Regions:
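Cap/lid segment of the alpha/beta-hydrolase catalytic domain
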Residues: 459, 468-590, 596-597, 631, ...
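Short glycine/acidic-enriched loop and turn motifs that connect beta-strands
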Residues: 78-82, 176-179, 272-275, 323-327, ...
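Short loop/turn segments that connect beta-strands within beta-propeller blades
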Residues: 94-98, 135-138, 220-223, 289-293, ...
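Conserved beta-propeller blade repeats
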Residues: 57-72, 107-123, 154-169, 202-215, ...
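Hydrophobic or amphipathic alpha-helical targeting/insertion segments
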Residues: 118-182
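Beta-strand-rich domains and repeat architectures in extracellular enzymes and scaffolds
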Residues: 52-88
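Predominantly five- to eight-bladed beta-propeller fold
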Residues: 30-37, 88, 174-241, 268-271, ...
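Active-site-proximal cap/loop segments of hydrolase catalytic domains
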Residues: 538, 546-770
């Protein structure tokens, strides 16, 4: 058994070392605007973490190293529950983190901040437009001056990225989609609220798709030349269809990368629309000529190809790739291609899987300065570490028939470090031959902070930079976390985290919570969450059990893929193994199961099969009726594969012709020209079993108190799933409660709604488990 205390190891040392000197200096040269939300000075009573304490934490993000490598620009969001909003402002710190200064005091969130190459300006987004300002350091104080808005884009700017010479900018804005509003069809109906669609993908995540993102290019200078639609170029101009760039709903400019000379852009795009879009994950990497608009494709003919990054010398491109179309949890391979410039235009050759012999997923690729190696992060055995893919010493000449030499992957962060590390945002090669990776880190015990990881022949050194929340963390009572490897019903090993309440005494008894992970493909790692916060749950007096059941993504692809086509099967037994194991401990009394999304499906399923294991359930945004879910969710590739189809997305181009009329193809899986092996009308055995064992078919077995939570704007798992589950619980005479948030999506985001969620969550658990 391996046990760490809260903020164990370097976390505890960092808090002890800097808690007394981490002071946010507010320069008088930076005026405070009405509506500014600053750092919370909350007092924690008796070391007890509460939802109020959770929402008081500052949320650090998007660090950017200064051009001279001496300072870091980053943002922190603070929340006012009373005002029901959060505001993000900017900070600058030195590399030791002992001089953190607040440099903006805006009443509107400031995001996407970037340095000028001389370090004298920054550009950022405020109020949906690009702004610039001068930044200066005088007598130890940072100050902004000469703020000016440099974009005037009516549809708004979502994000921007400057070219390497900073003479151009690419930015995300929005164009009309295929979905019509009333005034698009009837000019006199300007107060009507309907929408009209003749194809799929008319809604996505939490919104009607009335507009889609496109990426535009414009000239840029920090002096303030205005950027407008009239002087911007749409990268997708001239395409036959309305494609997205970047891909909805969460894609950003990490999906586009400037070449080192600024003349080309590599980007990821799914050039599909309507039904084909809804059933496919096939994005490709394209190379766009900024001057001519010409475009070429790196055609992988598979699933997601995302996150392209040019090497600093322009000789290579790296990206993340999934092999199979329609399967969004396929292995994330780190791909690399050579770029030949001998004919003036970039010609791609020698595509190589740099992680071919690495069994985990890769994410967040970052090139080394010499263009020989690629840094990335990966969830491996329950924690997210940093890795390096080392390129071969010798590259085959361009156009050579010699197969490029393999790459070698090495771990950078130590295997026993119970923290999640991001990819580096800056890599520094030091005079002594060591390399320092500036990155982010967090754990179940503290939110994201900045960290420097220095590697050399003598080992790895970790240096905490920021401690934005040390004033809160230092007030909280410590607790213990344990990693258990449990035996599954089929003789495999399953990592299960267990968090114990503060002042845990094994001679006493405590209630427990088994967490059912969403996804279903994901991982219960050392991440920090403001929605499902396990330290908060432990602080409420619960033993928190986190089983990395079948389908989780940090234990190799075989463990991940087993769940597809087997939702009612082994992963449900994994939950029961974890729950029965902890319930057998003398210090555990009653136990609940709680989960969101697929975790909500798990809860509804366990309601019908658990017998007398659990004493209460909470399902948030859970799938209840799989048949109806297939017909109402938006990204249809997901249930089509995972519900038992297990096929790559395939389309019959002959559909609608005499030789292939619309309708069934006679193979039991192809309908409307689309292979729908995971549909309710499929004859695939796994799909038939999947729908037969949908949770709604097991409600006659329900007898345990159930709370149902759902967002009214959830289009991934529509709200009627939760309403149906609650109605059935009521019909079965099961004690039940319904909590609906009409203005929230799959997640509960607004501060007062988040507070309501937490209070009602614990009220239900306390009622039935304490």
């Amino acid at each position: 058994m391996k046990t760490y205390k809260t903020l164990a190891g370097i976390g505890a040392l960092a808090i002890a070392a800097f808690a007394t000197i981490t002071i946010m200096k507010n320069s008088s040269e930076n005026p405070q605007e009405d509506g500014f939300i600053g750092r919370s000075e909350i007092t924690v009573e008796n070391g007890h973490m509460t939802p109020e304490v959770l929402l008081a934490f500052g949320r650090l993000s998007d660090p950017q190293m200064s051009p001279d490598g001496k300072h870091i620009l980053y943002g922190v969001s603070y929340t006012s529950v009373e005002e029901n909003r959060s505001v993000r402002n900017l900070y600058i710190c030195d590399l030791e983190g002992s001089d953190n200064q607040l440099i903006t005091k805006s009443d509107k969130s400031i995001v996407n901040a970037r340095w000028s190459s001389d370090g004298k300006h920054i550009a950022y987004i405020k109020g949906g437009q690009i702004w610039t300002a001068k930044v200066s350091l005088k007598k130890g104080k940072w100050a902004l001056s000469d703020e000016r808005q440099v974009s005037n884009v009516p549809a708004g700017v979502g994000e921007f990225k400057l070219s390497p010479d900073q003479k151009k900018v690419m930015y995300i804005s929005y164009v009309k989609s295929h979905v019509d509003k009333p005034v698009d069809r009837h000019a006199d109906l300007d107060k009507a609220t309907a929408y009209v669609s003749d194809d799929l993908m008319y809604r996505h995540w939490d919104h009607t798709v009335l507009e889609i993102p496109h990426t535009f290019i414009a000239d840029f200078d920090f002096g303030g030349s205005e950027i407008t639609p009239d002087n911007s170029v749409d990268i997708l101009a001239g395409e036959a269809e309305l494609y997205e760039l970047p891909t909805e709903p969460f894609g950003g400019l990490e999906q586009l990368s400037w070449s080192p000379d600024g003349k080309y852009i590599a980007y990821s795009c799914r050039k599909l629309v309507g039904k084909k879009y809804a059933f496919s994950t096939n994005t490709e990497i394209y190379i766009y000529n900024v001057e001519t608009g010409a475009c070429q494709v790196i055609d992988m003919k598979g699933g997601y190809d995302t996150d392209p990054v040019w090497s600093p010398d322009g000789s290579k491109i790296a990206w993340i790739s999934m092999e199979r179309d329609g399967y969004e949890a396929d292995k994330q391979r780190l791909m690399m291609a050579y770029v030949d410039w001998t004919k003036g235009e970039p010609m791609v050759w020698g595509i190589t899987d740099a992680t071919e012999d690495f069994k985990y997923n890769a994410a967040g690729p970052v090139w080394s300065a010499d263009s020989k190696n690629i840094y990335f992060n990966s969830l491996a055995e329950g924690v997210q570490g940093m890795f390096i893919a080392k390129g071969p010493d010798f590259d085959a000449p361009a156009g050579s028939k010699i197969k490029p030499a393999p790459w070698k992957v090495e771990r950078i962060t130590d295997e026993d470090m119970w923290y999640d590390f991001g990819s580096p945002f800056h890599v520094a090669e030091n005079e002594d031959g060591s390399t320092t990776l500036y990155t982010t880190w967090c754990s179940m015990d503290f939110p994201t902070e900045l960290m420097a990881v220095t590697t050399s022949d003598f080992g790895t050194r970790y240096t905490s930079i920021t401690l934005e929340n040390s004033h809160i963390l230092s007030q909280l009572a410590e607790h213990e976390t344990e990693a258990r490897w449990l035996d599954t019903v089929d003789g495999k090993k399953m990592l299960t985290w267990v968090l114990y309440p503060p002042q845990f005494d094994p001679s006493k008894t405590y209630p427990a919570i088994t967490i059912c992970l969403g996804g279903p493909q994901g991982t219960l790692s050392q991440g920090w969450s403001y929605r499902w916060n396990y330290r908060l749950m432990a602080s409420q007096g619960y033993v928190v059990v986190l089983p990395n059941r079948r389908g989780t993504t940090a234990f190799g692809q075989e463990w991940t893929e087993q769940i597809s086509g087997d939702y009612p099967g082994l992963n449900m037994q994994d939950y029961l193994v974890a729950a029965r194991t902890i319930k057998a401990e003398p210090y555990v009394d009653k136990i609940a199961a709680c989960g969101a999304s697929y975790g909500g499906y798990s809860v509804y399923n366990l309601c019908g099969i658990h017998g007398d294991v659990f004493d209460a359930f909470i399902a948030h945004a859970g799938i209840f009726n799989e048949e109806h879910m297939y017909m109402t969710t938006e990204e249809l590739w997901f249930p089509n594969f995972d519900n038992g189809g297990l096929h790559e997305a395939e389309f019959d181009p002959r559909v609608g012709t005499p030789e292939c009329p619309v309708g069934p193809a006679g193979d039991g899986v192809t309908f409307g020209g689309i292979k729908q092996g995971g549909s309710p009308w499929s004859t695939e055995p796994k799909a038939v079993r999947h729908y037969k064992l949908s949770p709604h078919n097991l409600v006659c077995n329900w007898h345990t108190p159930l709370m149902v939570i759902h967002g009214g704007m959830d289009y991934r798992v529509p709200v009627d799933q939760g309403m149906a589950a609650y109605n059935c619980a009521q019909m079965m005479g099961v004690p039940s409660r319904l909590l609906i948030f009409p203005d929230e999506n799959h997640w509960i985001i607004k501060p007062q709604n988040a507070m309501m969620w937490h209070r009602e969550y614990f009220r239900w658990l306390d009622q039935w488990c304490k």
